[in-house]
Amino acid sequence: ATLYETVPRAVTFDPTAGYSATTVGGAIKIDGVPLSSGTGGNTTASGKLQAMVQLRDSTATTMQSQLDEIARGLISAFAETDPSGTGALPDTPGLFTWPGAPAMPADGTLVPGLAGLIKVNPAMDSTVGGSASVLRDGGAGGAGYVANASGAASYSDLLIRYSQNLDKPIAFDP
């Protein structure tokens, strides 16, 4: 295809082999001039390339950040807390964990790529030697976090708290 008049313009692209949550895409250049992206929800892009650059550099990165914040919310909602209520033990990841454990991701702070890093806590995963009863009883963070010391099968306080945590609003990094 011919861009501009009758002489084909040189369109170049600096390729990127793979994209992580923090990768900045390579520039698209026409005659050596970087192509700017469109802006806004009703895009200002005046062509398919500008719209694609906007999608890659703005829309997709916003969606990635939103997924990362949802992942942080899950880690926080299912966190184990000090069962004594004294606050002597810090909160620690419960059902969902991440590479920064035993610390919790900071509230209201974006952790780029977190959605791709969270996993089910091995303490609760029977396929790797854990037990699903740890979700009901507590203890993924160690013996100090066990809330159901008797092991009663009808104990549901933690499960109810997790459900209530999912209903709470959380602060997202803008």
Where are these regions (language model features)?
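S/T-rich, low-complexity, solvent-exposed segments of bacterial secretion/appendage proteins
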Residues: 1-174
